[in-house]
Amino acid sequence: MTEAHVVGSLADEDKYFYNEEHGLPIITSLFRGHLGRDVLEIGAGTGTIAEWLVREGAHVTAVEPEPILARKIRAKFAAGDDVRVIEADSVGAYAALAAEARTFDTVLCVSVLEHIADDAREFAMAAAALRPGGRYLVFVPAMPLLYSRIDRETGHVRRYTKRRFRELCRGAGLEVVSLRYFEVLGILPYLVVYKLLRRPSITSSSTGVYNNVILPLSALVDKVLRGRLIGKNLVLVARKP
């Protein structure tokens, strides 16, 4: 996570699917074909995605501002693993990497951008860190209509639209390779539980239902719809010319 975010519960890997084994196959299926061998991950959480990237043969620079999570990432890897952990927010990390003239062929940002107030600056920094032809891979919550108390409680500044992503890419000089919705079946449960009933937190039971029922079914439906219609999340693949 980066910048304006809530600590406490956000450090609990059981609450956020992208840091769990349940959600990892989804992320890998969405991004595998676009990954390079030199990856910068912004908001690496507990390191589950970084661990997968290393297994795929990538060199990983994992950025994580929360000390407890940064320690978890370091604990996952042996001294010989091709991983560097930067304990900083995205602004500090990008500045340090720029000072080293360090660039990447992939910048990965999963469920982080929605926590950042100045998302245009975030896009610009990511673009500057990419080599020509490099990819910026982003996964965020979609549909401002769904914005609710749970978004505020977990530090979400916004939920995204395709239009906003196109604007951000233009501003940063990036080309949109693909922009698709994900998780159409998650819309109704989210709307009922968090928007209408105004539940203030994510429970272990709801996480279990989400991981074991909604997420797998959504993945199947999304394969048919190919992210064209609507979904609870947005997935961006952008390219630096």
Residue positions per predicted region:
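Feature marks short, surface-exposed loop/turn motifs that line or immediately flank catalytic pockets
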Residues: 94, 144-146, 185
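Conserved N-terminal segment of class I S-adenosyl-L-methionine
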Residues: 1-102, 106-110, 123, 227-234
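Conserved S-adenosyl-L-methionine
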Residues: 174-184
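A short glycine-rich, Lys/Arg-flanked "PGG" loop and its adjoining helix->strand segment in the class I
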Residues: 120-135
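Short, glycine-/aromatic-enriched active-site segment of Class I SAM-dependent methyltransferases
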Residues: 136-158, 162-170
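A C-terminal cap/extension of S-adenosyl-L-methionine-dependent methyltransferases
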Residues: 186-241
